[in-house]
Regions:
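Hydrophobic residues embedded in beta-strands of well-ordered beta-sheets
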Residues: 38-39, 299, 483
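Structural signature of tandem-repeat unit edges
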Residues: 25-36, 48-63, 73-86, 96-109, ...
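A structural signal for leucine-rich repeat
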Residues: 576-577, 596-598
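N-terminal Sec-pathway targeting helices
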Residues: 1-16
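Consensus positions within tandem repeat domains that build extended binding/scaffold surfaces
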Residues: 45, 65-68, 88-93, 111-116, ...
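N-terminal type II signal-anchor transmembrane helix
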Residues: 12-27
Length: 607
């Protein structure tokens, strides 16, 4: 009996000891460290309601890992030792009370979303050794007023400073070559921007919504200003474009309501729709007797909805959307000096039936003739190398289309819904035909290829030609050496035939596939190609694969292991989105940096 009570007493004492240890370990915050890396911050029991914690990261630490301090709202200050080289993805994301952090001179890399949503951070100095700052690294830092960028920085990634509402000044490094999409979008107090001459391209939305921006110094070597780059910069009154500028994107300066002074150099060869819409300068442009609003060599807009239009001979550029929606327009005579037709230029001109594109034209933008339902035939100039997305979509009266011999690319849904086309010849130089390029051309029955494109995808879906393709023994449809569809979605195993170089978008999507044996020649895998394959557990892509498109393995809920060979040069966004049970990924370090992994994934780098 005594031994029984003695045993019970030991158990009780053991429980008390464990409880005391738990309290001791969790009373105050502590860091989880492994191999000189901060893996995780654990808040103590008394820390959870405190708002002014100071964190000291120990000497010798080399990296702060993904999500290490994510959403730690109690932290106000962080001191990082000189040994730290990398701050990984989302390391301090959502630390809303973080006001002060020192970045050591040893630091080389700040990864994507590292300080996203740190709304109390006011000043930050980035050391000179930092060569990489990832996407959205400081996005949503609404109190950030000052930031110094190192001269070592070459690129400012997309959305890096998006929504930094109090940022009023920034000095750009003299070696910057690229500013990516939306980098300073919504920085409503940014007043002056002086860009270095090393910059040749400003991507879309970079300064969109910067309402206080009053002065912009553009680089002398700038060639491209992309879509909506300065849209909504309502304090900007003048802009100088050098002779190097060639392209202005959609809405590039749209709604810059005070913009009244701008020079248009002769070098400009492409102009997107609504480029200067809402500006004082554009409002003052005169309209000629034909209702055409143009300046120098650029036709911006046809303001009258007329049956016949004669484009002036001096016009070499028709801006995007110039005649869009003109349902009265029937006949257009283009200038024989014309070089470019912008996107959506004649989109929705439902009664247009007569237009001859001169051989001088080198560029036709996306959707340029979409929904021109009366247009019977059109001759595409031999200078055209790219036919972009939706260019001739729903041109229902097209009976035949002759593609130029120099053509290299046919975009997504370029000829979708051209229901009368029966035959087409794909020239030998075509390298890529994007998905839906000829979809819903219901009478298309004969397609000939002079060459061997690298990617075809679901280009011919819902055509007689597509329906005539026979399935192989594994229920797969092929066009040449391209796998375009797994027809029987209940099939559990597929061996892809030798020589196959591409797999189309969604080819295996929502199937019950468990095992895929890829061809050794495979080079490209399309968007969502293996998406929603709930029974798939292991994927080993073949050596020699070059590109994996975005969302390739989306929502493969039971996927455990993925092997991505070192031959892969690039991957699209979110290839593992929703595949939260992946335990192990073999991949090169370079490609791993482009993939968002869930926290429980073991990433094993391959040489």
């Amino acid at each position: 009996m005594k031994s029984k009570y003695k045993f019970l007493g030991i158990i009780i004492v053991g429980i008390i000891v464990v409880f005391i240890l738990y309290i001791a370990l969790n009373f105050r915050w502590h860091l989880v460290l492994k191999d000189n890396k901060v893996i995780e911050y654990k808040a103590g029991l008394v820390d959870k309601n405190i708002r002014n914690l100071t964190i000291y990261i120990p000497e010798g630490t080399t990296e702060i890992m993904d999500d290490a301090f994510s959403d730690c709202k109690s932290i106000e200050k962080v001191y990082i030792p000189e040994s730290v080289k990398i701050i990984h993805r989302r390391a301090f994301i959502g630390c809303k009370n973080l006001k002060e952090i020192n970045l050591p001179e040893s630091l080389e890399k700040i990864d994507r979303d590292a300080f996203n949503g740190c709304t109390s951070l006011e000043v930050i100095r980035i050391p000179e050794n930092v060569e990489y700052i990832g996407e959205s690294a400081f996005s949503g830092c609404t109190d950030l007023k000052e930031i110094s960028l190192p001269q070592s920085l070459k690129k400012i990634k997309e959305m890096t400073f998006y929504g930094c509402e109090n940022l009023n000044n920034i000095e750009f490094p003299q070696n910057i070559t690229d500013i990516e999409m939306g980098a300073f979008m919504g920085c409503v107090n940014l007043e002056v921007v002086k860009l270095p001459d090393t910059l040749s391209h400003i991507e879309g939305y970079v300064f969109s919504g910067c309402k206080a921006l009053r002065e912009v110094d553009l680089p002398n070597n700038l060639k491209y200003i992309d879509d909506a780059t300065f849209n909504g910069c309502t304090s900007l009154s003048s802009i100088y474009l050098s002779d190097s500028v060639e392209e202005l994107g959609y809405n590039a300066f749209g709604e810059c309501t005070k913009l009244s002074e701008i020079n248009i150099p002769d070098s400009i060869s492409q102009v997107g729709a609504y480029c200067f819409e809402g500006t004082e300068w554009y409002k003052k442009l005169p309209v000629d007797s034909e209702g055409l609003k143009y300046y120098k060599h650029i036709l911006f807009q046809a303001t009258y909805n007329m049956e016949d239009v004669l484009v002036p001979t001096e016009i070499t550029v028709i801006a995007g959307g110039a005649f869009m929606g003109h349902d009265e327009l029937k006949r257009v005579v283009l200038s024989d000096r014309l070089k470019t037709i912008g996107g959506y230029a004649f989109s929705g001109c439902s009664n247009l039936y007569n237009i001859a594109i001169p051989e001088t034209v080198r560029y036709i933008g996306s959707s340029a003739f979409s929904n021109c339902k009366s247009l019977e035939n059109i001759s595409i100039p031999e200078n055209i190398t790219h036919i972009y997305g939706n260019t001739f979509e729903n041109c229902e009266k097209f009976q035949y289309i002759e593609l130029p011999q120099g053509l290299e690319y046919i975009g997504k849904e370029a000829f979708k819904g051209c229901t009368l086309i029966k035959n087409t010849l794909i020239p030998k130089n075509v390298k890529q035909i994007d998905d839906g390029a000829f979809s819903m051309c219901i009478n298309l029955e004969n397609v000939e290829f002079e060459g061997e494109p690298l990617y075809i995808g679901n280009s011919f879906y819902d055509t007689k030609y597509y329906n005539s393709i026979k399935e192989d023994e594994y229920s797969c449809k092929y066009i040449g050496n391209h796998l375009i569809e797994l027809v029987d979605k209940k099939r559990e195993k597929v061996i892809i035939k030798d020589g196959t170089v591409s797999i189309a978008n969604k080819a295996f999507s929502q199937s019950k596939i468990r095992e895929i044996v890829f061809s050794k020649e495979l080079k490209m895998i399309g968007e969502s190609a293996l998406g929603h394959c709930y029974r798939l557990e292991d994927v080993e892509f073949p050596d020699g694969l070059i590109y994996i498109s975005k969302l390739c393995l989306i929502d493969c809920r039971n996927l455990k292991r993925v092997y991505i060979p070192k031959s892969v040069e690039d991957v699209g966004e979110s290839i593992l989105l929703g595949s939260g049970n992946v335990k192990e990924v073999f991949v090169s370090k370079e490609i791993a940096e482009k993939i968002d992994f869930y926290k429980n994934v073991k990433v094993r780098y391959i040489d």
